[in-house]
Amino acid sequence: MQSGPVVRAMMLLAGAMALIPLMDTAAKSLSTDYDLAPASIGFGRFAAQFIFVFLGIALSRSILGRRIQPGRPRPTLIPARPLIHLVRGALHGGGSMIFFVAVKYMPLADTIAVFFIEPMLLLALSAVFLGDHVGWPRRIASVIGFCGALLVVQPSYQLFGAVALLPLLAALMFATYLLITRRYGAGEHPVTMQLWSATGGMVTIGVCIVVGELVGALDYRLTVPNLGEEIALLALMGIVSTAAHITIVIAYQLAPASILAPFSYLEIVSATIFGYLVFDEFPGGLQWVGISIVVATGLFIFLRERMLELRPTPIGDARAAPTTDLDG
């Protein structure tokens, strides 16, 4: 039986969460091993995304693109609400840049641990501004998932100083970015949205670099990558981020933010894997317990929403409420 939109959205978001830590790993390597400023890394990441998406739009609107996908909707260069999507891109760019600054000084897993306040913020924002119903099962799943993430990374109290405020600020900006995606994404082509997200990100980070050069802020200065490994890593970041965030846009077009929020915790599983492969950090026993909790939380929400989608509509109730607005 074909999956409904909510289940498809959860599967898409789970896939995106598996990709994003690869970009974070590349960003940390560029700032620590190659001495690129985090702001310049962020600008390069969004510049690469802009190039890839622009070329994709040009190809899709060419004769070749129409032959490959006949009858499919084509992405456009200008969305229906350009200003809204510029603001969305500014939030995305600013949040990414701040996160890259934090990950330069903090361990990758610990930075992500602090950032994981984002699903909590998203649940609250979606309930207040979008009117999403947040039932107790979703609330409990989010809390349990956050506790599992803390077990994975084992953050110390020393992290909650001035530097720890950076991933918290990034989490707030990214939660707002996702909220706007949910509110204004309907009817927009995901590829077009990513083009304008990249544009807004480049403008925002570009302004920060200019200010950073004027005031001498090292993390916000302009550093030019070489044509070897540094450019390759930035290109990888652009490809991964484009694929992941197009997937995120589609997911949030299909399902409410309050349902998808717990699945953000799956990112910590992928981050743990990349931490082992790249930095030789192998999880201990307590971390494996946390990973199991995170996976179990996502599976619980997945199976529950699947059951709600398959539940038959009562006879005579032609206007029954959608399953995504039930008791959690």
Question: Which residues make up each language-model segment?
Answer:
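Transmembrane alpha-helical segments that form core, pore/gating elements
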Residues: P21, K28, P38, V53, ...
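C-terminal-most transmembrane helix of multi-pass membrane proteins
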Residues: V269-G328
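Transmembrane alpha-helices of multi-pass small-molecule transport proteins
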Residues: Y34-G94, M173-Y177, S197-V215
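Helix-helix packing/entry segments at the starts of transmembrane helices
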Residues: I112-I117, Y184-G200, T242-Y276
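Loop-to-transmembrane-helix transition segments
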Residues: A9-A14, R66-I98, A162-L168, Y220-A243, ...
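Hydrophobic/aromatic residues within transmembrane alpha-helices
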Residues: L30, I41, A102-V103, L108, ...
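Loop-to-transmembrane alpha-helix entry segments
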Residues: F115, G131-L151, Y157, G161-A164, ...
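Specific alpha-helical transmembrane segments that line the substrate/conduction pathway
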Residues: S40, A47, F100-L130, A257-G275
